[in-house]
Amino acid sequence: MTAKVILNPYSGRWLAQKRRPEMEAALRAAGMEYEIIETGGPGEGVTLTEAAARQGFSPIIAAGGDGAIGEVINGLHRASPDGVLGPLGLMPFGTANDLVHNLGLPLDLGEMARAIASGKTRRIDLGTANEWVFDNNSAVGLEPMVTLYNIRMVRLR
């Protein structure tokens, strides 16, 4: 099957965009067929992922930080009426990469590409708050306020 990479080019303050060629080389070296689509702004990863999942792409690869991963998971959730999400691959380009660290996954793109290509999966628990599915954490107070402020910031190159 062909994988769909949902790339947030802004992740890690444009780190994802800069490392895109490295990611593509890693996916090719792992023998993967893939298509890449870039998100254009906050929330777009949800709709792009939902469409990709409904079109039969598998796995879906979230290329970005924790926010991008969250959007991809929500897109997979919307595409799955039975609540069972399809396989998800991760390409860590974020500032913190909390989920990747908490799962003990490698930050090396080559290692991640080989892991995705192997097809090995594991289940993780998800939570829901106000119809938003979360994979790693949910917060109140300062953290979401900082996130909202960050979303409104101009994305300078």
Predicted features and spans:
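Glycine-rich beta-strand-to-loop/alpha-helix junction loops that act as flexible
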Residues: 9, 63-65, 91-93
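ATP/NTP phosphate-donor binding region
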Residues: 1-62, 70, 74
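Catalytic core of DAGKc-family lipid kinases
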Residues: 30, 39, 77-157
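Short, active-site-adjacent cap segments at secondary-structure transitions
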Residues: 68-70, 98
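Positions that flank functional sites
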Residues: 42, 67, 115
